[in-house]
Amino acid sequence: GMGVSGGEEGALHGPSLMPGGTREAYDALAPILKAVSAKAEGEACVDYMGPDGAGHYVKMVHNGIEYADMQMIADTYFVMKNVLGMTAEEMADTWEMWNKGELSSYLVEITARILRKADEMTGKPLVDVILDVAKQKGTGRWTSMSALALGVPAPTITEAVFARTMSSQKEERLVLSKRYRDLAFEGTEVDRPAVLEDLRQALYASKICAYAQGFNPVSYTHLRAHETLSDL
């Protein structure tokens, strides 16, 4: 099998491909896969992942890392909005600036674009009127389960899965929100530039941790030579 990543843009301009199976099959298909795949710095975004279901396993872990990445962005947004009192436009400007540095990535780029998007009916920032529920297809949960089965830590990924689970429990959250007063940040004096720099560095460090945690189960599985990735 083969993991495929890229979404709509990947379909139009080339995806990232993670093939698994026999080496002979990969070698036979490699010219075609490299031709249709995305390119980064002149290199095809495709490589042999290993035997059997290795390609799908790597794609699963890729999704788990993405779960963590999106949750870290959501946590950063929460602090920007509720602690620093930033508007959607101010946040968009900040994310755009961050995307020019070491945080440059697709998710950071589209975060800025999303924050600039206005709801056509109300004129309000779209992010303020959409349903605050994030569902999941299961790949993040499977990544956490695999890490637990292997005995390797993946706390950032796992907490991102739990955050989505809590997000989907809308009715329960509404009940609890009536029992607990909102955290009162009003009147709290903060050094916005300093806090934003702390947020940027914290987000960068957290990203590194999430990637390391994703590589953990992949590396550990590879070292267990008596098993193939499809056994997990």
Task: Give the ranges of each region predicted by the language model.
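Short acidic alpha-helix initiation/capping motifs at coil-to-helix transition points
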Residues: 68-71, 134-141, 209
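Rossmann-fold dinucleotide-binding core
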Residues: 1-92, 100-129, 167-191
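Short, surface-exposed loop/turn motifs that are enriched in glycine and acidic residues
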Residues: 66, 200-208
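Conserved small/polar residues in nucleotide/adenosyl-binding loops
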Residues: 221-228
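A glycine-rich phosphate-binding loop feature that marks nucleotide/adenosyl-phosphate handling sites
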Residues: 95-98, 160-166, 230
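A conserved active-site cap/scaffold subdomain adjacent to cofactor or substrate pockets
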Residues: 131-191, 195-203
